[in-house]
Amino acid sequence: TKGIQLTNLNFNALGKQIIATNPMFRPGDKMLAVMPMFHGFGLGVSIHSMLVNGGCCILVPRFTPDSYAKLLLKYRCNLIAGVPTLYEALLRLPKMKNADLSCLKGVYSGGDSLSVELKKRFDQFLFDHHATIQVREGYGLTECVTASCLTPYHISREGSIGIPFPDTYYKIVEHGTQKEVPYGTEGEICLSGPTVMMGYLHHPEETAQTLQTHEDGLTWVHTGDLGYMDPDGFVYFRQRLKRMIVTSGYNVYPSQMENIFDAHELVQMSCVIGVPDKLKMQKVKAFVMLKPGVPANEETKAVLMTYIRKNVAKYALPYDIEFRSELPKTLVGKVAYRVLEEEELKKLSETAQEQ
């Protein structure tokens, strides 16, 4: 674990960027702040950016879908921000069935990949409940406080995480180099701007790897994330390099696989991981949470495998689909894929000992 050194300037620059990208904001607007204050998303966006611009924060001391919905409806909050699992939970909540959400001016998703299918469903949910907005997906990392890129107001492109904040610059480079790649070409996402950290506390080597001065004289954060940019400046996040699965020499992107699973009518949510394999290096495994009432049996598994075969390359096919009633979550509500990876490693270790 590394400590990230952030400054007052970093936080205040973020506050100005948030307002610049949200022209509908007015002093007195209320943010329902569910993200923890130890997280850049919670402290930087939900609290600091609101308070310095005259907004109001409604804190959620202990999150449950019911308590969140109760506060949202009681205080008629104008802005909500959270990870995708929050919006999935709201869709399933009976209390929200007849809710009037015309009070909402902004709905923001970050901290984890928002599937195309979930965005479509929640956008429709907002429309059906009298909101005149859509989910705006963002991207960022703690090395720049939190968000540094956001879908523009009332404009979106499928699969895009938006455009950079004012005074923040993005480029895509060949991984391991500073060489910029053409539009539409996948590479490592790099960013530069006033919210970039001072460095990692007491880790000069890691700081030098992440913060690099390019030929333009600017300091760039090498994020370790794969993505690309289109000619209009819209950025597309592909996958964190650390999560990428390499099977038989081919790259498999878990977030892409999860998007495909989540688009199926039987699936509520999914998580795809790589499991060590002697022959392939890694093999693909999917964990699936089914929609209420769908039986977790071999017939359902066969239906999903048939569907997946039609939508992915042969090398990306999962060797197994495991059904779960719930998927593990981190403290900020993201799907805890590392927990699933550790479970699989433990199984492999136990099997090896038995042999």
Short names for language-model regions:
Residues 163-167, 177-212, 252:
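Conserved ATP/PPi-binding loop(s) of AMP-dependent carboxylate-activating enzymes
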Residues 334-355:
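Phosphopantetheine-dependent thiolation modules in NRPS/PKS and related acyl-activating systems
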Residues 12-30, 38-79, 93:
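Conserved AMP-binding/adenylation subdomain of ANL enzymes
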Residues 27-28, 104, 132, 186:
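Phosphate-coordination loops involved in phosphoryl transfer and adenosine-cofactor binding
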Residues 80, 193, 198-199, 209, ...:
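AMP-binding/adenylate-forming catalytic core of the ANL superfamily
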Residues 1-16, 151:
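Conserved AMP-binding A3 loop
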Residues 3-5, 33, 55-62, 136:
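Short beta-strand->loop structural element characteristic of the AMP-binding/adenylate-forming
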Residues 77-82, 91-160, 169:
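Gly/Ser/Thr-rich phosphate-binding loop
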